[in-house]
Structures are given as structure tokens and as C-alpha cells.
Amino acid sequence: MLPFLLATLGTTALNNSNPKDYCYSARIRSTVLQGLPFGGVPTVLALDFMCFLALLFLFSILRKVAWDYGRLALVTDADRLRRQERDRVEQEYVASAMHGDSHDRYERLTSVSSSVDFDQRDNGFCSWLTAIFRIKDDEIRDKCGGDAVHYLSFQRHIIGLLVVVGVLSVGIVLPVNFSGDLLENNAYSFGRTTIANLKSGNNLLWLHTSFAFLYLLLTVYSMRRHTSKMRYKEDDLVKRTLFINGISKYAESEKIKKHFEEAYPNCTVLEARPCYNVARLMFLDAERKKAERGKLYFTNLQSKENVPTMINPKPCGHLCCCVVRGCEQVEAIEYYTKLEQKLKEDYKREKEKVNEKPLGMAFVTFHNETITAIILKDFNVCKCQGCTCRGEPRPSSCSESLHISNWTVSYAPDPQNIYWEHLSIRGFIWWLRCLVINVVLFILLFFLTTPAIIITTMDKFNVTKPVEYLNNPIITQFFPTLLLWCFSALLPTIVYYSAFFEAHWTRSGENRTTMHKCYTFLIFMVLLLPSLGLSSLDLFFRWLFDKKFLAEAAIRFECVFLPDNGAFFVNYVIASAFIGNAMDLLRIPGLLMYMIRLCLARSAAERRNVKRHQAYEFQFGAAYAWMMCVFTVVMTYSITCPIIVPFGLMYMLLKHLVDRYNLYYAYLPAKLDKKIHSGAVNQVVAAPILCLFWLLFFSTMRTGFLAPTSMFTFVVLVITIVICLCHVCFGHFKYLSAHNYKIEHTETDTVDPRSNGRPPTAAAVPKSAKYIAQVLQDSEVDGDGDGAPGSSGDEPPSSSSQDEELLMPPDALTDTDFQSCEDSLIENEIHQ
């Protein structure tokens, strides 16, 4: 089908003498492609750079004035980690009976303590600029986790790749394009820099095809080099734990242990944790602690000032300046005391019901990786036999009651990677929810794919008529590319919330879904449809299913290679480099949510709670997708319009610096699996493949499908696609793959480890490394005699990190100067 289509396109293309009028009319009226001086690039570059400087100045001001945005939550989190580490070190020290030297442990404690987000090296007006360069990768690893280091390493390899591509494109391909004489001999013509300046029979076109294949090889080599240095660490606990779905809902942990130990004689089950529906329990626990913090806050305030505080308990109550019926003020301590008591009762009732809400899932931890792999292979082999010779897993006396024939067994994700509150959403409900959300998302993006649909709608009301004939680069290039950037910046936020409401079980799954959906929509929005002169997906489908498809297709594909078409994408990359990265520093979506939550707070105590809990994890999925969209645009046009590559390199350099700052200062660490990073590598490889597609279409339009350059490009493209499909679907051609990971195992919870010369203790395992929801771990030490469901009861008591925060006085959270700034801010809030 593809060769027939290309051959038809080549035949009809030769008969279409001048498709420019059609392509221009398909654009934003007649104001986007008009043969401006060098495509309007100098004007757009100057405007975007001035906007960039203005946004940096605004960020520096906001950083000094609203310094608590994105910082108090990080300080609170660092302080919580520091207290948790200190308690763990003390428990280990006592339990080990003074065995060995504790230097290494206290060195880790110092590392955590030193990662407070506000330090003395960036407390000036613009000193944060130099602080970005002084942050080391080891500091980022300690504070932000290994995923942040992998992400930044990925960016550095992309930068290196763009440096090589830029040298080849600007140093060789650009002079070759200049050597043509097909277009007018004008020094200010942007078209002279493009491949459209070469005649169809020029032998220099072989150079472009060869360079496209070379870029593909360079991309694969760069990604293999990145993945070979990635050294992805997998915790030993994760490799020894299986996640079982489809288990009998009322199966007990002892019965699960008995099954595996009977079925596998050499197997020792260390722990079996059934899963329960804890979504409402987690909600009540969070609300209870908020109320307790509010009561503690106003109790401390009254002890200082000896004056009771009155509050309006309605949302936005602190903004209401008039007392009307239904919005009367109440005494703060009394209100929060009643609210806390009510929530405590609801919490206890819900906790008693948790045992009655099993999910039919369990996490089972074994004594070593070998037996874990054997059990996993046993279940998966049986499942893969189909209806012909389906076998049963190894039986035991408990097989029938546990329904082992219905089990789905896989490796468990990291405990920090799990959304415990989402485990209860599954089966038909989850799929229906996912379908509805994605249908709504598709309908929304169906009509708002590009800014062209907005401007063409404005044209119907003659809004742009007065400026249509000005032929000004500000009108024709700056605003369309700015609009395109605004929509492409809004799309990741929309896609992220769609993935969030899908209720994925793991953070990695949520990020992967966001990355793939966002990348697909962005490529359609930013690259494919604007390149083809299509203003939205509705026109795309009308064109695709029209009876005159083949006749119109040639004209559509000619739109890709108009002389000034590349200028639109050059200007888009410039806007992304300067305005996009500056807006990433400001974090406008997060700032808006922060302001809304502050406005909805009912008192100063709740505003303080908002400030302490408004920092979020870095969204690797959306970040990868947006970055790969710009990279794909750059690589796709790197040969047909080589002037775009230096601006793509500028974008990646600024993006790298901005992300280093945000990861270290503005976001909480995230724990993901390697699939999110491998998915980004696959998207990188897609970029040079699209470049080959572009060259194939150009050669087919100019010389026909049977021309030598067209046939060579087609063969290379087919071989590349076949290799990619065989590798992705069947695992072949591993040596030609862009993936070259090396896995390292971290011994976090082995059978007989020794830490610093001391024997291990139960206290050495942090709570986050247990396959049980945090709210159930807290329940183990509530003191009311109720243990967490599925717990063995032999674990030593340890206080909840969040409950510790409640019992600490406000002035004892940390001993840093930054915390004293927080206290003074809160006091100023109180007296306002």
C-alpha cells in the first residue's frame, strides 16, 4: 500500500505546477507563509530573547518575594527524612550492642541533613544562576534519586548528539543547499537554506539521504552509550517479591505462605501481605492529621497571645470580610477539636472495616531471587500454553481454597512506586473509566489541535483583516508560534490530569501513559498537521477519507517542502527555547494551583499546611514527551531545513539547566522503574526515522517514487522499521538496539546482610521499603491494640513520620536559618 501511495503521489506531484496558493490558503489565512525577510526568524529571535530576559527578571523577583512557593514543603520533607534517619540510626545503634564503627551511617545522616533546599550558596538576587552550575550529580542523586540522574544524563547525550548533527547540518548540508539556484537569488530569502533550493536531478541530493541514515546511526549509538552508563539499580527486595492478583479475597497470609512452602520444598516465604481497600482510610487519615495540626497551631498561638482566635470555617473563609447568615465565625480551637474528634471516630470505624475489604491481591517476599524467578516462570509458562495444553501450577493442600489457577503473577514494583489508594479501582470499572476519560480527551484535542483553528475562526469575524496586509513578522510569525507553544504547553497538563484520573496502580505506569499520549498528541499538534497545512484533526479526517484522496494528497505533501515552511518550525523551537524554558522556571500551572489552594484555606493553620504540602514529584512522563517533541521537530527538519539545529541545541542547553534547578530546588524525589527511561529512548529513535520519511516524501514529490534516491531512501526506511518492530515485538536484533542497560542490585533486605559490621535488625528496614500502605503501618503503633491487616505483630514499634510532625512544636522543625524564615512568615500571617 505504501509503495503504491508514494508512486501515485510522485506521479500527481509532477502534474501540480504550483501548489503554493493552496498551501498558503490552508494556513492561518495568508499571514503565516509570506516570504518574509529570512522567514521572520531574526525578529522572532529578538522578541523571544527579550521575553526570556523579562521572565528571568520576574522569576528572580518572585523568588525573593514569594520564596515559600515550592520550598516550605521541601524543607518539611527534608526535616522528616532527617528525623526518620536519626531514629533509625539510634535504633540500629542500640540493637547492635555497639558492634562496629558507625561512621558510614552518620555520614548518610549528614548527607540527608545537608540536602536542605535553601542553602547559603543561592540566597542572592541572581546567585541562583551560578548555583545551577555548582550543583553536582552526586548531590542530585542523594536528594532527588537515581531517576533524576538518569534523566539529566539522557539530556546530556541528546545535547552531544545535537552538537554532532549541528556541525554536519550547518557545516555541510547548509552550504549544499545554498549552492542551488532553484529559488530567487536573494540574500534575505529563507528558502535558499532549505532543500527546496536544489533541482530535482541534482546529484547532491544523495548527500542528504546519506546524512539522514548517518543521523539514525548516530542516534542509536548515542542512546546505547547513554543506557550503558545508566547502571539502573534494582533493590534486592523488589527482585525477591512477587505481586499476585486474582487470589481468593479472604485468603490469610499464613495460608499463602503454606502454599508456596509446600509446593516448592526449598522455598522460604519471609512475608505475605494481602492488600486491602485503604482509599477512604487514607483520606480520613490525611484529614485527621490536618485537623490535629490546626488545633495544635491555634493552641500554641493562644498560649503565646492569651487571646482566642475566631475563624470562618467555610472555604475561602479567611477572604470573607463580612459576616452574613451561614458564615458566622467560630472559635478556632473549639472548631478543630470537634472536627478532629469526628474524624478520629470515622478513622477508627473505617480502620476496623479494613479487614472486611480485601482486594484479592498480595505481595509475597521470598528468601532469594532464584526461587522467586522459578515461581514467576512457573506461573507465566502455564499461562502461555493456551487452551491446547494448559497446565496447572504446582499444587498444595491450599491450592483449591486460594484459587491458584486464577492467579496473575508478576514482579512487584517498588513500594514507593505504588499508589495504594488506586489498587481498589480495577477490572471493568477501571477500563470503563479509562475509556471515558480518553474519549473526552480526544474530543477536546480534536477541535483544539493547533492554534490555526482559533485564528481561522477569528478570521470569520474579520478580526485579523486590519492587520492581514501589514506583512509584519510580529503578526505573521511571532504570534502564531507563540500560540502553538501555548497550546503545546497546555497539552501536557491536560494529558497529565487525564492519566491521573485514570487511577494507575503505580507512578511509573502513570508517567509512561502520560509520556506516550502526550508525545503522540504533541507530534500531531506541532509537527505533522502544521507541516501538511492542516489546521485541525477534523480537516485531517475529512482529507483522509475524501473520495479525492490521492489527488489532494500530492498537494498536501507539497506543503511540507515550501521554501518558507521551515521558518515556522524554526520560530517554534526558538519560542520553546526562550519562552518555554523561562515558563518552566516559573511553573505557572503549579503556581496557579498553589494560589487556589491558599484561597480555599479556611484559616492561617490551613494556609500553613498548604505551604508545607504543595510540593509535587517531578513529572518525568510529561517532561520527556515535551522535550522529545521539540527534539523530533529538530531532527525531522535537520536536513530539509538545517538552520533549525543550532536553535534546537540552544533549547536543549537551556532545558538542561532549568531542569537541574527544578529537580534540586522545586520538586520532591520520585521512585520509578526503568520502563519510563527506555520509553524515552524509543521516542528518540523515532526522530531520525521521521527525518527519513520527510526525505522520502520530498524525493517522491520531486523525482517520483522510482528515482534512485527515492528507492534508496525507501529501502533504508523499510529495513529500519522492520528492525525496530522485530526488536520491540520479538526481542530480535538486540545488538542493533538503542538499549544497552546494565542492572545493579542493591542489597536492602537480604537474608543475612551485615551493615557496618553489625548484624541486621528489624529497625534497619525503613517503612517505605515494606509492602504495606503507610496508613496501615501507622495503625500498627496507634496504641489501640489493632494491628495492621496482614501484619505479623512481631515488628518493633516506630512512630509515624507525620505524627511526629504533629507532636513537634512549631519552632523545633529544623535548626536552619531557612526554617526561622518560615516561622517569621507564619507569625506575620497571624498578625495580618
UniProtKB/Swiss-Prot annotation:
Pfam families to which the protein is assigned, alphabetical: PHM7_cyt, RSN1_7TM, RSN1_TM
Modified residues (Phosphoserine): S111, S113, S114, S115
Stated consequence of mutating R433H: Found in patients with neurodevelomental disorder; does not affect localization to the plasma membrane; abolished phospholipid scramblase activity
Location of this chain's protein in the cell: Cell membrane; Endoplasmic reticulum membrane; Lysosome membrane; Early endosome membrane
Record note on what altering D584K does: Significant loss of mechanosensitive ion channel activity but no effect on its localization to the cell membrane
Catalysed reactions listed for this entry: Ca(2+)(in) = Ca(2+)(out); Mg(2+)(in) = Mg(2+)(out); K(+)(in) = K(+)(out); Na(+)(in) = Na(+)(out)
Short sequence motif Mediates endoplasmic reticulum retention: positions: 86-88
Posttranslational modification: Palmitoylation is required for localization to the plasma membrane and stability.
Impact upon substituting G580S: Found in patients with neurodevelomental disorder; does not affect localization to the plasma membrane; constitutive phospholipid scramblase activity
Membrane topology: Multi-pass membrane protein
Homology family: Belongs to the CSC1 (TC 1.A.17) family.
Protein name, entry field: Mechanosensitive cation channel TMEM63B
Species annotation: Homo sapiens
